């Protein structure tokens, strides 16, 4: 839901559904809507993985083919090609813009990119691109699905297969959040990460939710605790101590 009360919904194959003047109490069928695809907009792909607000006059859009942005001034989507290490950066599943004009991108297959945002408030230009990978850049090791803002831990990145990484400014690279070896390897298949008010990280995996406080203090919640299903796709904060979880078999509150 953006500043104009337009509800943007990205789909995996059918582009973007825009619902105008959205209100929770309204029936969606009563709202004016529009579908944006590669055939009627500047989208690079109809598989749209993330839509994020910006401090500038635009929205960031990550899709199968890379990065796009929606210009509020021009009322249209534009593709923003990213080339690094002689290849185009694609499969963008999460985007995080910092207060000091840095943009972080998480890719499922190509690692993480950090860039400085230049240009104008209406038309960004990405500069000083740096790419961060694990295991020598091997494609299957660099499935990064999510970015979470930490405090002293800096940014956290969820990896499907290798757990949670954090960015270390000193070494200018990614390092594992924990050296703990879980007995069930599915706990290293991380999709969402969110922080609660007690400074715990709620880490969604394919084997439940890890409530992580520190290297030696964490709890696991999954189907054994009454969850409908242990595969967690998303975590949404409802209030300070109330969260919604989406699973393969429905929602959990």
Regions found by a protein language model. Give the residues of each.
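Carboxylate-rich, polar loop motifs that coordinate divalent cations or form catalytic acidic clusters
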Residues: 1-253
């Amino acid at each position: 839901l953006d500043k104009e009360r337009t509800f943007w919904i990205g789909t995996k194959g059918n582009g973007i559904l825009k619902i105008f003047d959205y209100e929770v109490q309204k029936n969606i069928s009563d709202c004016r809507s529009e579908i944006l695809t590669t055939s009627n907009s500047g989208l690079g792909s109809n598989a749209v993985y993330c839509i994020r607000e910006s401090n500038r006059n635009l929205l960031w859009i990550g899709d199968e083919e890379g990065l796009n942005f929606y210009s509020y001034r021009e009322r249209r989507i534009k593709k923003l090609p990213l080339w690094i290490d002689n290849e185009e950066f694609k499969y963008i599943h999460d985007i995080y813009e910092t207060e000091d004009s840095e943009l972080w991108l998480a890719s499922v297959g190509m690692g993480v990119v950090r860039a400085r945002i230049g240009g104008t408030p209406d038309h960004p230009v990405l500069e000083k691109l740096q790419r961060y990978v694990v295991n020598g850049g091997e494609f299957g090791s660099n499935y990064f699905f999510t970015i979470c803002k930490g405090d002293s831990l800096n940014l956290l990145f969820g990896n499907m297969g290798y757990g949670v990484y954090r960015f270390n400014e000193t070494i200018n690279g990614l390092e594992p959040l924990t050296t703990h070896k879980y007995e069930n390897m599915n706990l290293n298949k991380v999709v969402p990460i969110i922080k609660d008010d007690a400074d715990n990280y709620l880490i969604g995996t394919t084997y439940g939710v890890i409530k992580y406080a520190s290297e030696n203090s964490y709890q696991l919640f999954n189907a054994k605790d009454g969850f409908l299903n242990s595969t967690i796709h998303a975590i949404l904060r409802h209030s300070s101590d109330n969260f919604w979880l989406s699973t393969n078999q429905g929602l959990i509150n």
